[in-house]
């Protein structure tokens, strides 16, 4: 009966060390990508920053870093081979993005988007790729109207109230000056023994009311027209972006 050959201890040890080296090398490049947990808010026309980092932190200068928008994977910004790949951007983001790489040596980058539009609202995905290993993180951008915090009624009240107070003050000063002027004129008339019609020095109440109210109505109407024009412009911009996304 032939005896079975047994592997020697050194060969088993070498095989184990080789397997351990392969496993450790396969896990050496792994990391996690971390983005903002809460939605990022921005106003139309402003700029916004979308931060992203890897954990544990490591130098990402030689990695491929980028942002894209699901579900069609439109490239928002791409960094590869140490350079920004502007030619691969979606047309609507060309010239509007900038990758802040001050802390890329620690695995931290930030995407800055200028001139925020209504069409920018929604999901963004940040990814880091190291050779064949890639991880990504999702984030959300909320785009808001500059006047989202105030209703039209409050806006009109805030604009009209100072004007109304000013007109009331002017009206009171006018009445006070009129009273003093009437007193001086009456004294002069008595001294000169001249007679005047008593209605000559009186100013009708409707003239005073008109003097106070008309300057208030003018700014109020102008403010309402300006507010409606601004909202129509923002709505038109939003519809134009929907018709021509590219």
From Swiss-Prot:
UniProt cross-references to SMART domains, sorted A to Z: IG, IGv
GO MF terms held by the record: signaling receptor binding
Membrane topology listed for this record: Multi-pass membrane protein
Protein task: Minor component of the myelin sheath. May be involved in completion and/or maintenance of the myelin sheath and in cell-cell communication. Mediates homophilic cell-cell adhesion.
Keyword annotations: Cell adhesion, Disulfide bond, Glycoprotein, Immunoglobulin domain, Membrane, Signal, Transmembrane, Transmembrane helix
Range of residues in the leader sequence: 1-28
Annotated gene: MOG
GO cellular component, one term: external side of plasma membrane
Keyword Disulfide bond part of the UniProt annotation: yes
Protein name: Myelin-oligodendrocyte glycoprotein
Protein localization: Membrane
Intrachain S-S bonds: 52-126
InterPro entries: Ig-like_dom, Ig-like_dom_sf, Ig-like_fold, Ig_sub, Ig_V-set, IgSF_BTN/MOG, Myelin-oligodendrocyte_glycop
Stretches of the chain found on the membrane's Extracellular side: 29-153, 231-246
Pfam families assigned: V-set
Glycan attachment positions: 59
CDD domains on file: IgV_MOG_like
Main location: membrane
């Amino acid at each position: 009966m032939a005896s079975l050959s047994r592997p020697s201890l050194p060969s088993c040890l070498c095989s184990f060390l080789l397997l351990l080296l392969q496993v450790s090398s396969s896990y050496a490049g792994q990391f996690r990508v971390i983005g903002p947990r809460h939605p990022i808010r921005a106003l139309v026309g402003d700029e916004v920053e979308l931060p992203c980092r890897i954990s544990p932190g490591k130098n990402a200068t030689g990695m491929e870093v980028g942002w894209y928008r699901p579900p069609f994977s439109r490239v928002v910004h791409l960094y590869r081979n140490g350079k920004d790949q502007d030619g691969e951007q979606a047309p609507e983001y060309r010239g509007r993005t900038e990758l802040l790489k001050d802390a890329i040596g620690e695995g931290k980058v930030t995407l800055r988007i200028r001139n925020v539009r209504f069409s920018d609202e929604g999901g963004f995905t940040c990814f880091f790729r190291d050779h064949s290993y890639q991880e990504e993180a999702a984030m959300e951008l909320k785009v808001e109207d500059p006047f989202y915090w105030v209703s039209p009624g409050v806006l009109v009240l805030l604009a009209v109230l100072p004007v109304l107070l000013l007109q009331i003050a002017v009206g009171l000063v006018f009445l006070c000056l009129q009273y003093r002027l009437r007193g001086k004129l009456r004294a002069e008339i008595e001294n000169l023994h001249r007679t005047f019609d008593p209605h000559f020095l009186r100013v009708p109440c409707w003239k005073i009311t008109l003097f106070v109210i008309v300057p208030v109505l003018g700014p109020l109407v102008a403010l309402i027209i300006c507010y409606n024009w601004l909202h129509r412009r923002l709505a038109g911009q939003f519809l134009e972006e929907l018709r021509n996304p590219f």
